[in-house]
């Protein structure tokens, strides 16, 4: 699989992680219907809901998203999620390669608290993802109530 070492992917990753940049997500897709070359498809500032609207039901795509949430009135947390999107209309051979290829993408987007496997846009519900991040972070101040 090639294309993951592209400088625009590294720059987008750095932008999502930066506290000084408004970019909150990036999306990586296959460059064409055949072959294994990956490319940066898009970035955005609108969080999880905007990212979900950009996913393609006929593709496997990988995303990296910044999630900010408050545990209480005085603390704000910033965490990152890695999203593996397998659209409902994705070809079988693309689906079959996800387990191998996702590990290569994770090497390029290494720092994340959770991995979200999604095949419906509803799987990217911000409240559910925040609950998972709280549990993964070990600082769930809501007594298990999410």
Where are the model-predicted features located?
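Long, low-complexity regulatory segments enriched in Ser/Thr/Pro/Gly and acidic residues
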Residues: 1-146
């Amino acid at each position: 699989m090639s294309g993951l070492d592209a400088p625009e992917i590294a720059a987008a990753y750095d932008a999502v992680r930066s506290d000084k940049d408004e970019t909150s997500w990036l999306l990586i897709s296959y460059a064409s219907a055949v072959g294994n070359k990956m490319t940066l498809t898009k970035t955005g500032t609108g969080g999880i809901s905007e990212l979900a609207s950009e996913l393609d039901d006929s593709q496997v795509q990988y995303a990296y998203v910044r999630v900010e949430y408050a545990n209480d009135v005085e603390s704000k947390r910033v965490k990152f999620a890695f999203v593996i999107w397998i659209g409902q209309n994705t070809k079988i051979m693309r689906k079959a390669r996800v387990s191998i290829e996702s590990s290569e993408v994770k090497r390029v987007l290494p720092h994340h608290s959770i991995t979200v496997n999604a095949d419906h846009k509803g799987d990217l519900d911000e409240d559910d993802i925040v609950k998972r991040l709280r549990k993964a972070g070990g600082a769930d101040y809501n007594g298990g109530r999410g």
